[in-house]
Structure formats: structure tokens, C-alpha cells
């Protein structure tokens, strides 16, 4: 205080002011500080001081020929004095204005191509909508965000090779352009930038912006996609936010969003198949997102999301070392623990075997809408500091932390039995059982947890069991903070292993991820996702399964045909017929399968004769495990369009319609492809197959009763006559042969006689 008073007195004297403002600075230390090194020590001051001078800019001498000495207003544009210490001219800022207005022009055709990212940004801002400004406390948390909209996802090395190839094609040095995206981009850019006069270094810099994802660790409240991050300074301050809707989307955000949706769908589907890991890999390899192979995107895209990371782990890629529980990303910041199996009793006296973490640990928990810091000891929550967007989000974080703490009062708060199952109908592990239970209803958990009086700490308040805030009391160990908890900033990736049930572990054996952690949120992808794998046919519903199954048979007819006659069991077990089974009423699956397999066997018994259309139509039904029964069917039911629809065993129906004239098949009105061969070539083999051991006597004869189906013929006694339904719904009269010797010739005569009987 004394010093300040003294200074004030000194400053009131004019002599002091004069000394401070007029005398030269001649202290060596100060001169050294401001003049040593190339680095400007006070750029703002230097700029102000320079711009106050008449000629603050230096230029090449050639400028004197290119710019007049004075402008139209008679102001001097350059000085005849040389710049001290260089061979350059001193120039006025007015010269820049003159140059911009009257200087030489050049072709601008390449500007939008080189400065593409800037032009696109201007367009997005032009069409964006800025809403009202709201003043409120901003809970910002630092997240790793993409700051560069509109980029491809090349690695720095890949991009470097592309840039060298495009900008400096004649430079020496090995460049290996291997990936598809590298080659496409190089070709495209070389064409675009032919005869480009813009400085190569600038082109290289701009190309880098276009090719490489740049991320920064920034405080964000709200949208994290790159089109929001580019206006971060306009949309959120310390105590205000401005609503904003981007005026356009960029492919990199769309890729990230679509990748997450595809990965979630694939993990969910893989979980319910017989071998989840193999299925997941098969689907990742056969899926395209926006026309690019999903596996290529996974290799390049740094998005961290549970399903995406499971897919990456399956491909043997490294992922982040943090682990996921209850939709929150946990990162241990200090402490350590050992794991031990322990049996505990729930409030319902059910025994659970849990892996207890023994030891003191601290974690950060980061979710979409809430974040927290958790300190815990063995089966005890010491402290939880949570912040979130709203009451609901905060409650979610508290439940997850309470379950994670493994405290006894949490386990005792369970009412009723725990029997949650996953999509494949397998019981969840005990920790997820507890989590699901309390996510459904946490009332008892909060009531039993206990409350404590709290001290008044800046920025922290208490929260009561009914999730209302309080300044006096709070749930034991739990506080709500105004400040968010930053996401884990490191981009370090670790080697992980994955088991066939898609559980991902680090090298110490800790589970980082499992399918239970994959969000059930459904979204609509921005880019087209093409799942070529039959396992994903059902994603678009029953109709898609039906159409896809028949399309697959027709596409692969050549191989299917050979397998049908030589190795039917292998054909029936093909995974492409799996989705179809879900359309067949459960009770009928086995019976239909038995019936169709018998029918096929009868067709096979006679060489070289079968009915293509009928085999295609009935084949998917033969895939279910068959039941041996004598049941006959003239139509088979499939559940589509919300009800059972019939496929006729003989003849067309709205579900399966084969047009003989065009040789095209329509399934539920959708084109399913064309048959390349003539289905009649071995006149409908069903007939000849059936009629082995029978004589055809002629057309239908009503005296012999209603037409029997193929299988019922076997019940006839030798010499007995009957009407029989053959082929596409025609009826003929047959008699069972009295002896078996001439069976072989039957099929040939049958074919001729059927033609006569029908015509």
C-alpha cells in the first residue's frame, strides 16, 4: 500500500513524467531483451508503432517500376530512401490499396479449387441461421474435436505423399500411393490444378487442410461436429450461448455419424449370431459407407465410440485405453486395484458373483450429457463430483457411479430378481444386471444410500434422493458442480484383444468394452450404408429379407444348382438362408422343411430333371431343421407386411411371381432378377420325379376322387389308380405299377405322356 502511495506522489510531479516518457532507454539488459533473437517480443506494440510511421512496409525495388510515385489523390506511395540494412524500398500502406485496385490481374479460375475449404466455409456461414443469444452458465468440457470441416481422412504420411505427387511431381523421393482414396484424390487434384499459378507452398498448405483431420482439445458445450466447432467463438462464451444452425453439412461429419450407426447395427446383429466375432468381421468387410469400404474408414477414422471401437478391436487396430460402463467413458487418473471374485447377496437374497476392485482409485467419467469425477475405495464410494445438462443426466451419472462403486447398500437396494438378457437371450453379467435394474428404477437405491450435511463450497451444491438440489444436505459423498470434467485428452492408443463374444480387453486383461455398452439409440445415417452381408438383410424389415434371399439364389444360381443336386445339406446350411427363417411361423418351420426336402429328394431321384422355378421358390424353406411328418402343403406361409402371406407350392402368388415370357421373378412386386436358363428345359422335373413307378393313364378322372398331392401317392397299393396334382397345378390320372422292374424308363415315358395328357 505504501509503495503505491509513493508512486502516486511521484507521478503527480511533472519531472517524473518527463523522465519516464522522454529519456532514452540505455540499460543494456532492457536493450538486450528487446533486440536479441528474431522473435518479436511485443508484436502488438510493434505493429502500432510501425503503422504510425509513413512507410512501414518494405518491398522489392521492382515495385518502383510497377507502382506510380503518387496516387490519384497525390499521396506518396513509396519513399526514395532505402530500407536500412537491406536492398529494399520503403513503402506506404496506401501502395497496398493502389495495388489491390489497379495492380495486374491474373486468372482466378484456380482460387475456388485451391481455397476450397474457405469458399465452402463462407457458403456454410452465408446459409447458416443464427438464433437468439441466451445468458446462462455454460458447462463446458474439453473434448477432442475436429476443427477442420470438409476434409478426407488420410494419415499425415498418406497426405504428404499425395501433396508431393500433386504439387511437386518432379521432386525426387519415393512416394507410395497405395490406398484407393490416395489414388482417387491424386488424380482429381492433378486435373483440377493444371496450369495453376498460385504459389506451390500455398497449394500444399491448402491441400493439407483438405486431406488431414486436425483435432484440438477445446472447451465445448453443445455440438461437437466440425461445422459447429468452426463457429465456436460465435456460439458460446463464458456466460452466454448463441443458437446456430449450420448452413450445410460436410462429408467428414457425415462419415463419422454414419460410421457410428453402421457399427452399432453390425455389433447388435453380430451379438445374436452363432459366432459373433466371425460375423462382425464378415459384416465390416462387406459393408460400404458412402461408397467407401467400411474397413478403410475404420483404419483412418479416429472416432471413439463403443461400437466403432469394438469393430476396430476386431480388425486388430489399436484403440483408446479408457473403458466404458453404462454409456460413460471411464479413465483412471490415479490409484490402482486388484480384482477378486466375491459372492454377494442382493436385497432379494439372490447370489451374485462380482469381480471386486480392491484398492483406492480415481476416475473421470465422461458421457454425452454429464461428466463426473469419482473417488472410490474397495466397495466404497468416497466422493462423486458430477455436473450435467439437467436433472435427468445428472441422475444417470449418479446411478452408474453408485453401481460401479459396488457398495453393499447398492446391492441390498435390489428388489425382485435380476434376470436381464442381451439380444441373444444370454444373461447379462452381474454388473450389467445391477445397472439395468437401477436404470429402470433408482428410487430404492437413492433412498437407501444415505444423506449427509454439507459444507458451503464455492461452485458446489448438494443433491437429495429425489434429485432436487440443496445447499444443506446431499446424498452421501455426492456433490453437483457447475464445472464440467474434461474428456481424457490423450490420443494414445493401446493394443487390445477381443474374444468371440466381442468383449475387448487390454493387455492386463481388464474389460474395456462389451456389446452391453453399445447404445440402442437409432438414427438415420447421412450417407448411404450398403450392407452386402446377408446378416444385415433384416435391418430393413421382413420384405427386404424376402427379396434379398431370392435375389441371392438367382445371382448364385449356377453354384446353387450344382450343390442342390450333389451336396444339398451344405446348401441348406448356408448362412444366407438364416434371416429367412424369422419370416416362417415358428410352429411350421420344421414341417415345411421336411416337406420341401422330401419333394427335392424325389426330384433328385430322376437324373437331369427338375423344375428351376420351384426349387428357387422352395429352397429357403428347406434350411430349417426338418421334422419327419407326412404333412402335405399346397401353400407355405411367410410373415410379411404385418400378416401371413402365402407362397403357392405350385403356381404364382403375389409373394412369388415368375413370368414365363420375360423369365423375370418378382417378389412382393419387387424385381428379384432374371433366370438365365430356360426353366422348362427338362420339362418340369417335378412331374417325372414324382411319377417314377407310376403309369400315366391320361387326363383327370373325377371318379377317382380329389387330386392327391405328390407325397400321398406313396400310399397307393400296386395297381391302384388316382388323380394327382403335378407341375404348375395340372391334374392327371395315374396307376401305381404292379412290378418295379421298368421304373427307369418311367421318367422318359412320363414326360411324353404328361405332355399328351395336358395338351
UniProtKB/Swiss-Prot annotation:
The protein's matches in Pfam families, at most eight in alphabetical order, are given as: Flu_PB2_1st, Flu_PB2_2nd, Flu_PB2_3rd, Flu_PB2_4th, Flu_PB2_5th, Flu_PB2_6th, Flu_PB2_7th
- For the keyword Kinase, the answer is no
Provide the Gene Ontology terms for cellular component. Answer: host cell nucleus; virion component
SUPFAM superfamilies annotated for this entry? PB2 C-terminal domain-like
Annotated HAMAP family: INV_PB2
| Self-association state and partner proteins as the record states | Influenza RNA polymerase is composed of three subunits: PB1, PB2 and PA. Interacts (via N-terminus) with PB1 (via C-terminus). Interacts with nucleoprotein NP (via N-terminus).
State the function annotated in the UniProt record. Answer: Plays an essential role in transcription initiation and cap-stealing mechanism, in which cellular capped pre-mRNAs are used to generate primers for viral transcription. Recognizes and binds the 7-methylguanosine-containing cap of the target pre-RNA which is subsequently cleaved after 10-13 nucleotides by the viral protein PA. Plays a role in the initiation of the viral genome replication and modulates the activity of the ribonucleoprotein (RNP) complex.
Specify the protein name.
Answer: Polymerase basic protein 2
**Organism for this UniProt entry:** Influenza A virus (strain A/Duck/Hokkaido/8/1980 H3N8)
Highest classification ranks of the organism: Viruses, Riboviria, Orthornavirae, Negarnaviricota, Polyploviricotina
Q: Which gene encodes it?
A: PB2
Amino acid at each position: 500500500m505504501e509503495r503505491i502511495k509513493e508512486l502516486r506522489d511521484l507521478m503527480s510531479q511533472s519531472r517524473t513524467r518527463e523522465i519516464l516518457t522522454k529519456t532514452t532507454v540505455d540499460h543494456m539488459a532492457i536493450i538486450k531483451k528487446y533486440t536479441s533473437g528474431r522473435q518479436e517480443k511485443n508484436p502488438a506494440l510493434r505493429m502500432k508503432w510501425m503503422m504510425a510511421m509513413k512507410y512501414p512496409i518494405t518491398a522489392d525495388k521492382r515495385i518502383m517500376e510497377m507502382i506510380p510515385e503518387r496516387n490519384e489523390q497525390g499521396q506518396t506511395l513509396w519513399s526514395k530512401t532505402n530500407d536500412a540494412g537491406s536492398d529494399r524500398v520503403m513503402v506506404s500502406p496506401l501502395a497496398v490499396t493502389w495495388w489491390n485496385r489497379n495492380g495486374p490481374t491474373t486468372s482466378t479460375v484456380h482460387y475456388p479449387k485451391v481455397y476450397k475449404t474457405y469458399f465452402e466455409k463462407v457458403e456454410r456461414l452465408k446459409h447458416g441461421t443464427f438464433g437468439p443469444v441466451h445468458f446462462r452458465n455454460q458447462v463446458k468440457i474439453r473434448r477432442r474435436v475436429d476443427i477442420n470441416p470438409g476434409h478426407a481422412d488420410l494419415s499425415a504420411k498418406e497426405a504428404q505423399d499425395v501433396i508431393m505427387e500433386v504439387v511437386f511431381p518432379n521432386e525426387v523421393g519415393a512416394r507410395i500411393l497405395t490406398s484407393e482414396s490416395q489414388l482417387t484424390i491424386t488424380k482429381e487434384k492433378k486435373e483440377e490444378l493444371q496450369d495453376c499459378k498460385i504459389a506451390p507452398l500455398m497449394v500444399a498448405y491448402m491441400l493439407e487442410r483438405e486431406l488431414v483431420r486436425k483435432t484440438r482439445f477445446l472447451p465445448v458445450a453443445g455440438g461437437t461436429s466440425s461445422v459447429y466447432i468452426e463457429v465456436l467463438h460465435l456460439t458460446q462464451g463464458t456466460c452466454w450461448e448463441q443458437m446456430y444452425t449450420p448452413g450445410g453439412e460436410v462429408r467428414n461429419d457425415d462419415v463419422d455419424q454414419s460410421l457410428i450407426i453402421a457399427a452399432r447395427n453390425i455389433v447388435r446383429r453380430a451379438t445374436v449370431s452363432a459366432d459373433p466375432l466371425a460375423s462382425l468381421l464378415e459384416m465390416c468387410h462387406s459393408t460400404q459407407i458412402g461408397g467407401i469400404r467400411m474397413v478403410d474408414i475404420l483404419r483412418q477414422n479416429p472416432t471413439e465410440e463403443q461400437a466403432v471401437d469394438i469393430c476396430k478391436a476386431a480388425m486388430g487396430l489399436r484403440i483408446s485405453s479408457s473403458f466404458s460402463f453404462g454409456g460413460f467413458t471411464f479413465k483412471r487418473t490415479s490409484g490402482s486395484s486388484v480384482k477378486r471374485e466375491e459372492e454377494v447377496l442382493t436385497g432379494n437374497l439372490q447370489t451374485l458373483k462380482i469381480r471386486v476392485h480392491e484398492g483406492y482409485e480415481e476416475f473421470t467419467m465422461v458421457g454425452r450429457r454429464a461428466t463426473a469425477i469419482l473417488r472410490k475405495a474397495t466397495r466404497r464410494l468416497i466422493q462423486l463430483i458430477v455436473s450435467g445438462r439437467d436433472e435427468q443426466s445428472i441422475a444417470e451419472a449418479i446411478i452408474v457411479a453408485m453401481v460401479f462403486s459396488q457398495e453393499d447398500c447398492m446391492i441390498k437396494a435390489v428388489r425382485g430378481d435380476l434376470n436381464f438378457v442381451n439380444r441373444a437371450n444370454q444373461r447379462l453379467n452381474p454388473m450389467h444386471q445391477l445397472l439395468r435394474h437401477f436404470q429402470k428404477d433408482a428410487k430404492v437405491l437413492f433412498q437407501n444410500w444415505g444423506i449427509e450435511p454439507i459444507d458451503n463450497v464455492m461452485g458446489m451444491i448438494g443433491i437429495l434422493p429425489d434429485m432436487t438440489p440443496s445447499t444443506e444436505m446431499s446424498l452421501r459423498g455426492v456433490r453437483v458442480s457447475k464445472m464440467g470434467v474434461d474428456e481424457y485428452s490423450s490420443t494414445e492408443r493401446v493394443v487390445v484383444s477381443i474374444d468371440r463374444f466381442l468383449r475387448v480387453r487390454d493387455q492386463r486383461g481388464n474389460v474395456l468394452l462389451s456389446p452391453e455398452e453399445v447404445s440402442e439409440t437409432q438414427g438415420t445415417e447421412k450417407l448411404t450404408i450398403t450392407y452386402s452381408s446377408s446378416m444385415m438383410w433384416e435391418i430393413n424389415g421382413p420384405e427386404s429379407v424376402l427379396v434379398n434371399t431370392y435375389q441371392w439364389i438367382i445371382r448364385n444360381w449356377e453354384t446353387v444348382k450344382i450343390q442342390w443336386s450333389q451336396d444339398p445339406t451344405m446348401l441348406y446350411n448356408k448362412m444366407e438362408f438364416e434371416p429367412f427363417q424369422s419370416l416362417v411361423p415358428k410352429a411350421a418351420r420344421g414341417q415345411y422343411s421336411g416337406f420341401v426336402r422330401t419333394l427335392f429328394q424325389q426330384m433328385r431321384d430322376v437324373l437331369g430333371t427338375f423344375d428351376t422355378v420351384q426349387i428357387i421358390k422352395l429352397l429357403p424353406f428347406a434350411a430349417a431343421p426338418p421334422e419327419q411328418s407326412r404333412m402335405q402343403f399346397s401353400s407355405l406361409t411367410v410373415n410379411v407386411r404385418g400378416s401371413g402371406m402365402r407362397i403357392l407350392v405350385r403356381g404364382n402368388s403375389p409373394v412369388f411371381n415368375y413370368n414365363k415370357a420375360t423369365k423375370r421373378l418378382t417378389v412382393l412386386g419387387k424385381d428379384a432378377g432374371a433366370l438365365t436358363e430356360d426353366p422348362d428345359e427338362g420339362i418340369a422335373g417335378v412331374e417325372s420325379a414324382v411319377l417314377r413307378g407310376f403309369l400315366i393313364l391320361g387326363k383327370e378322372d373325377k371318379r377317382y376322387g380329389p387330386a392327391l398331392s405328390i407325397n400321398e401317392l406313396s400310399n397307393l397299393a400296386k395297381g391302384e389308380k388316382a388323380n394327382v396334382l403335378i407341375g404348375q397345378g395340372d391334374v392327371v390320372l395315374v396307376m401305381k405299377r404292379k412290378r418295379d422292374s421298368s421304373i427307369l424308363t418311367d421318367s422318359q415315358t412320363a414326360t411324353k405322356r404328361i405332355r399328351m395328357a395336358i395338351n
